[in-house]
Amino acid sequence: MHMIKLCVGVSSFEELESYRNERAHWWDADYGEDVHVHRTRMMPKRAAEMEGQASIYWVIGGQVVCRQPIQRLAPYTDPEGKNYCDIILAPDLIRTVPYPKRPFQGWRYLKPDDAPPDLGANENADSLALAADLAKLGLI
């Protein structure tokens, strides 16, 4: 079981990469080096199915464009007593075949059969742009 989430405030894959690289050091003290942490309000009820084998699929500009492996899920309580879930993510951002996705609130579960496939290592910028255009037209 995977997760899918809107990447709010980010307009491209490259911007997400930059954001991740700039903020990785924020979490060193809590979770170690080379991780990215996304804090969300709700702990997944299906966490046992996800840790170490799932990814979070990022929706940017109305399309799923990449995924990031989930290493683990950790409970967090802020100083005011509110409970959260820290999603500890591997540093890798893996491009996927662009797949259209309408806006939604929060995160959602994503079945493995519904997840877009990863792009091959030999994909180039032209094929990415073409795939994005075809996805916008609903053809892939």
Question: Whereabouts are the PLM-identified features?
Answer:
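Short, well-structured hydrophobic secondary-structure segments
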Residues: A24-C66
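Well-ordered alpha/beta subsegment
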Residues: G106-I140
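Long, hydrophobic N-terminal alpha-helical segment
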Residues: M1-V37
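Short, well-structured alpha-helical interface segments that form or flank functional binding sites
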Residues: S11, G52, A129
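Aromatic- and Lys/Arg-enriched surface recognition patch
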Residues: R67-P116
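Short, intrinsically disordered, mixed-charge
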Residues: N21, H25, P75, K136-L139
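Generic secondary-structure boundary/loop-capping signal
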Residues: M3-K5, R39-T40, G61, R67, ...
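A generic structural signal for short beta-strands and their flanking turns/coil linkers
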Residues: H2, G52, N83-C85
